[in-house]
Amino acid sequence: MIAEAKITSAEEAADKIIEDAKKQGESMKREALLEAKEEIHTQRNELEKETRERRNEIQRFERKLEQKEESLSKQQKQLEQKEKEIAQKDEKITNKEQELEKIYQQQVEELENLSGLTTQEAKDMLLNRVREDISHETAMMIKEMESRAKEEADKKAREIITTAIQRCAVDHVAESTVSVVSLPNDEMKGRIIGREGRNIRTLETLTGIDLIIDDTPEAVILSGFDPIRREIARLALEKLVSDGRIHPARIEEMVEKAQKEVDEQIREEGEQATLDTGVHGLHSELIKLLGRLKFRTSYGQNVLNHSIEVARLCGVMAHELGTDVNTAKRAGLLHDIGKAVDHEYEGPHVTIGAELGKKYGESSNVLHAIATHHGDEEPETIEAVLVQAADAISAARPGARRETLESYIKRLEKLEEIADSYKSVEKAYAIQAGREVRIMVKPEQADDETSINLARDISKQIEAELDYPGQIKITVIRETRAVEYAK
């Protein structure tokens, strides 16, 4: 009985659970249905709202399209109207062109009848005249451009040369052909002369230098055209005077020592010249020859100093022109190298210098510059032109080269005298140390052609009557002035 009661109780409990579950399930079902309906309602409202918005947008777009269609329709009508107007104008223009063509043909026929020329003949005549005018204008334009280019080139050249001179300004000391050796007392003169003059004869024989012993107190003058031999004699004599032992054997010994010292000095001077100019890689023999130039002069100007100055001028001008500075300086330093041995070889120093440069491995540009620096050949490289210019600048610098004062003044006076001898000359001035004669002519007595002939005549007379180094420039100036006053 108890078991049946438990079973009945369990069944009732199970039925109750099932009932409760059914109720709970129905409740959840109803809630789910309600939620689904609410979701559907919400989505429907959103869809309707979106649909309305799209509909409104479409309506707005349709209205815009309608407005554009109306605008296009108006524009089309306007274009059609303009096309009609243009067509009418084209027709009028065509008619006008036809009328003008008829009038033109009539005028051409009338002109042909009046001039007796056909249209082609008149055209050819006009073209020929135009060609002549164009040719004349072209020639004038070319002449003007050439003149302008020459002025610019001259201006640039003056700037470059001025810069070079300013940057390479050096002092000049004129060299002479004598040296003076100081003596401690006048008794030393007798010892130098020696018994029956044997000492002085030995020294003169060994050195080739004349010893002048006169009334000059405590001094002996050495005279000779070869500066190297004169320097050897000077050093030897100074050593003999300092030593006090003067006899032929001692003289020979001192001359030999002096010779070695001068050789060493020559080498040192050559090396110093290359260092001063920044020229490297020279053959040792060329360096020695450069050193020998220290003892050479040209019109009183030391040739080594002149060569160093030319090298520096070439370097500055080459830098300004943007060309090879090293080659220009090298050519400038070696341009007078032939003067170191020109008394030992036959021929001008430019030819000797070029041969020496070729012998010791210098480049063709350097050799060409050496060979052309005196104008014997036409320069074909910029370095050769620079060497010519620098050589002229160095030589023409006031005080660089020296003549005797008397001959110098006489030459200047003679230059002015020759120029003043012509009737059309008003004034004449010898300037640039006698390297230029500037002549003012009377404009009423000399025209342009006469001035050209005058310059030629004066230059010929100077060539015939005067001896001078280098060349003299003759400049004839003709000036006409017209003066009026505005009141």
Swiss-Prot record:
GO MF annotation, one: RNA endonuclease activity
GO biological process terms held by the UniProt record: mRNA catabolic process
Source organism, top-level taxon: Bacteria
EC number: 3.1.-.-
Domain HD: 303-396
Stored SMART domains: HDc, KH
Acyltransferase in keyword set: no
Species per Swiss-Prot/TrEMBL record: Natranaerobius thermophilus (strain ATCC BAA-1301 / DSM 18059 / JW/NM-WN-LF)
Keywords: Endonuclease, Hydrolase, Nuclease, RNA-binding
Annotated stretches, region: Disordered: 36-55, 63-83
Cellular component GO terms, alphabetical: plasma membrane
Entry-linked InterPro entries: HD/PDEase_dom, HD_domain, HDIG_dom, KH_dom, KH_dom_type_1, KH_dom_type_1_sf, Ribonuclease_Y, RNase_Y_N
Domain KH: 177-240
Family membership: Belongs to the RNase Y family.
Protein name: Ribonuclease Y
EC category: hydrolase
PANTHER family on file: RIBONUCLEASE Y
Lineage of producing organism: Bacteria, Bacillati, Bacillota, Clostridia, Natranaerobiales
Alphabetized Pfam families for the sequence: HD, KH_1, RNase_Y_N
Function according to Swiss-Prot or TrEMBL: Endoribonuclease that initiates mRNA decay.
